[in-house]
């Protein structure tokens, strides 16, 4: 959530930054007008309350002296009614301000490219060279069925579209991947966490999914619970409402969890395969950092995600998302896109973001600065390290062989009992 004081004092800068994120200046102007009206009413209310206190003392004095205070009482009752009217107006204005400010996206960092959509994203670097196949490549969904490791038909029967069963070496490959990812992140100083897979509405507000993106989630009817769309939500909210010791920062968390997405608005997109599911595993990285260190931590986090792809030998590229393509809470985002041979393109497999103090303000996560003793908002960062199902897809396609088998990447073999290849039965 943005700082209302910042909007008030640096209106033109904030308006210009949010314009690049598709926010109309009229929206901010209306917010500013509401804020000014609110501040005027607060002054009036305080003045009336001060006058009422004086009148109350005068009435008490008159009664002690057995004087007639009828008119003074009537005047004070009118003042009290005026105060109540103003307070009711303030409640209404506060709600209008909240309705606007809670759905305003974060302001982009100055280094973020300006653009409308993914066409304006900027490629930063590439790693690895896509393999030149001398046979016709298969899509991962066909490989999965032929190898008897992915079962889409029964997933649809048991649950519905965009669900599947992993089986045999497919299940072992999925498990090997997330254990490998967690082990690599732990080496980099991340604390492993097992989170709840349901959170409450306050947690969804804290990380920015609520109220704007409720349609993308799975809520449990008649409860305060929501299935997590990413482990970012419980990990970030771990410290919600707390003041941390600045000496302990930065703090790194990692967790593997299922992620549940309704994929509202994705009808017709990636209807086959592991790219877009309602339920999938993801290894998440979350950081809590001091403001002056957060962009260095973003680079480190992105490197941590890249490390996984490099050790798996999967070609990828790093993209800096433009202002029009970033997520709601992000101030800057790098996407990692892995090469998918059957589609002859790169597809997102990780997204690493610095939200600066946007989530921390919503969730009230602060730290006490050891330098001056002041309590300040910290910065939160989050990143995929990696989306496990998409990594399975990338391995199946990039490591496929002409005979229909798939070679298991060397770093995963210790996690799979020494297996070296997945072969057709």
From Swiss-Prot:
Q: Which reaction does it catalyse?
A: tRNA(Ser) + L-serine + ATP = L-seryl-tRNA(Ser) + AMP + diphosphate + H(+); tRNA(Sec) + L-serine + ATP = L-seryl-tRNA(Sec) + AMP + diphosphate + H(+)
Q: Which InterPro entries match?
A: aa-tRNA-synt_IIb (IPR002314), aa-tRNA-synth_II (IPR006195), aa-tRNA-synth_II/BPL/LPL (IPR045864), Ser-tRNA-ligase_type_1 (IPR002317), Ser-tRNA-synth_1_N (IPR015866), SerRS_1_N_sf (IPR042103), SerRS_core (IPR033729), tRNA-bd_arm (IPR010978)
Q: Does the keyword Aminoacyl-tRNA synthetase apply?
A: yes
In which residues is L-serine bound? 230-232, 284, 384
Name where it's found. Cytoplasm
Give the residues the record marks as binding ATP. Answer: 261-263, 348-351
A single GO BP? seryl-tRNA aminoacylation
Keywords in alphabetical order? Aminoacyl-tRNA synthetase, ATP-binding, Cytoplasm, Ligase, Nucleotide-binding, Protein biosynthesis
Q: What is its EC number?
A: 6.1.1.11
Q: Looking at the record's lineage, which domain of life comes first?
A: Bacteria
Q: Which GO terms describe its molecular function?
A: ATP binding; catalytic activity, acting on a protein; serine-tRNA ligase activity; transferase activity
Cellular component, GO, one term: cytoplasm
Report the enzyme's class at the first EC level: ligase
Q: Primary place of residence?
A: cytoplasm
Q: Does the keyword Lipid biosynthesis apply?
A: no
What is the similarity comment for this entry? Belongs to the class-II aminoacyl-tRNA synthetase family. Type-1 seryl-tRNA synthetase subfamily.
Record note on quaternary structure: Homodimer. The tRNA molecule binds across the dimer.
User: Any notes on this protein's domains?
Assistant: Consists of two distinct domains, a catalytic core and a N-terminal extension that is involved in tRNA binding.
Role played: Catalyzes the attachment of serine to tRNA(Ser). Is also able to aminoacylate tRNA(Sec) with serine, to form the misacylated tRNA L-seryl-tRNA(Sec), which will be further converted into selenocysteinyl-tRNA(Sec).
Name of protein: Serine--tRNA ligase
Question: What is the species listed in this Swiss-Prot or TrEMBL entry?
Answer: Streptococcus pyogenes serotype M3 (strain ATCC BAA-595 / MGAS315)
Q: Which gene encodes it?
A: serS
């Amino acid at each position: 959530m943005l700082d209302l004081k910042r909007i008030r004092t640096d209106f033109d800068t904030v308006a210009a930054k949010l314009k690049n994120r598709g926010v109309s200046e009229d929206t901010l102007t209306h917010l500013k007008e509401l804020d000014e009206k609110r501040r005027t009413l607060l002054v009036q209310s305080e003045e009336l309350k001060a006058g009422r206190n004086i009148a109350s003392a005068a009435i008490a004095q008159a009664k002690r002296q057995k004087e007639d205070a009828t008119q003074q009482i009537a005047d004070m009752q009118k003042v009290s009614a005026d105060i109540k009217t103003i307070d009711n107006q303030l409640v209404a204005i506060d709600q209008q301000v909240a309705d606007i400010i809670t759905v305003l996206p974060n302001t982009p960092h100055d280094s973020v490219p300006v653009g409308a959509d993914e066409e304006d994203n900027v490629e930063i670097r590439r790693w690895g060279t896509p393999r030149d196949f001398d046979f016709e490549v298969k899509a991962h969904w066909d490989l999965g069925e032929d190898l008897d490791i992915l079962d889409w038909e029964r997933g649809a029967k048991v649950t519905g579209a965009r669900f599947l069963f992993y089986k045999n070496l497919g299940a072992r490959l999925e498990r090997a991947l997330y254990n490998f990812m967690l082990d690599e992140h732990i080496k980099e100083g991340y604390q492993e966490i097992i989170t709840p897979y349901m959170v409450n509405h306050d947690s969804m507000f804290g990380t920015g999914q609520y109220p704007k993106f409720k349609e993308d989630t799975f809520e449990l009817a008649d409860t305060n619970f929501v299935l997590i769309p990413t482990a970012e939500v419980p990990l970030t909210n771990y410290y919600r409402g707390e003041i941390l010791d600045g000496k302990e920062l930065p703090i790194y968390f990692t967790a593997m969890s299922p992620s549940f997405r309704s994929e509202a608005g994705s009808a017709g997109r990636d209807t086959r395969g592991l790219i877009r599911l309602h339920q999938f595993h993801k290894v998440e990285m979350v950081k809590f950092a001091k403001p002056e260190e957060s962009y260095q931590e973003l680079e480190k986090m992105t490197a941590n995600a890249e490390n996984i792809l490099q050790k798996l030998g999967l070609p990828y590229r790093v993209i800096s998302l433009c202002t029009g393509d970033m997520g709601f809470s992000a101030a800057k985002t790098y996407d990692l896109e892995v090469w998918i041979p059957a589609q002859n393109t790169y597809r997102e497999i990780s997204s690493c973001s610095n939200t600066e103090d946007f989530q921390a303000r919503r969730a009230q996560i602060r730290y006490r600065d050891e330098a001056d003793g002041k309590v300040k908002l910290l910065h939160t960062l989050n990143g995929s390290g990696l989306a496990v199902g998409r990594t399975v897809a990338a391995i199946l396609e990039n490591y496929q062989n002409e005979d229909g088998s798939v070679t298991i990447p060397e770093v995963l073999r210790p996690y799979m009992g020494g297996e070296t290849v997945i072969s057709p039965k």
